[in-house]
Amino acid sequence: MDFIKKYLYVCDHPGFFELTQETFQNRWFPAQINLSVDVKCLSLMSEADVNFYKYLFTFLGMAETLVNFNIDELLVDFECHDIKHYYCEQMAMECVHGKVYFNILNMLFKNNLAATWEFAEAVLKDEALQKKLEWLESKIKMAKTKAEKVLIFYLIEGVFFISSFYCIGLLRVKGVMPGVCMANDYISRDELLHTRAAALLYNTMIPKEERPSSEWVVSLFKEAVEIECAFIEAKTKQVTFVSMDDIRAFLEATADRLLNSIELPRYYKSDPPQSCPLTYTGCIKNVSFFERESTEYSSFIINDL
């Protein structure tokens, strides 16, 4: 019977079943992102701005693989069909994100792969990124229990990339890079779903008696907010439209939302900035994905026999 339960699918987690269905409905593909107008926008941007976004997309492109490694390690601790099915879908979407980031980098570096790799080598040695990665590595090593591992994963999903998405969203405010902005909408929407999944994993699969103290969790989030602020602040000198006050407020509001989602009180009690450029992160613009033109987002199955 144990063998049958392990290999014969039955719905064993309605919450993750629903998230998997939502992922199916929200599927999209790299070919849907048209960067032809974005190429022309490069000449409208300052050198400092272009270099900043090269840096962000190089970081994000490499980070997608890191997330999939973390998922592989996390799933070892859970025997649940619906959890595994959901995370298979999430890993597939992370691969889509990685391909889109490659296409964007290809556009930014004008199809010069050697220049892209050379730039990526420099990014890996960058002090701001090193501090961020060292902090994250220390927290991953520190996480011994299942609860701590899930919390670190939740933190990665919810905080580790969010200030980068915010800065990319500012391109829309500048009136440039429509394809990149659309990709950022799709990806930030996906990452919101991934963050909801990590919260669901913690809330439903980690018994309350096994969870760390609220003080421990809040301390972890406070450190993450400071690390993320320092990461962006180090790279945004001379970059237009970036306000560190707004980014800090956004990060604090995001941390509060994440804490609330795992049944803990808000710590910062901050509100996101009114000018928040992100559509799908639950910060200020409550626009439903399905209220946008469905033809922009949906793939249609033709002659499906």
Swiss-Prot record:
Gene: RIR2
Main location: host cell
Enzyme Commission (EC) number: 1.17.4.1
Protein family per UniProt: Belongs to the ribonucleoside diphosphate reductase small chain family.
Record bears the keyword Oxidoreductase: yes
Cellular component GO terms held in the UniProt record: host cell membrane; membrane
Keyword Electron transport: no
Name this protein carries in UniProt: Ribonucleoside-diphosphate reductase small subunit
Organism: Alcelaphine herpesvirus 1 (strain C500)
Record note on quaternary structure: Heterotetramer composed of a homodimer of the large subunit (R1) and a homodimer of the small subunit (R2). Larger multisubunit protein complex are also active, composed of (R1)n(R2)n.
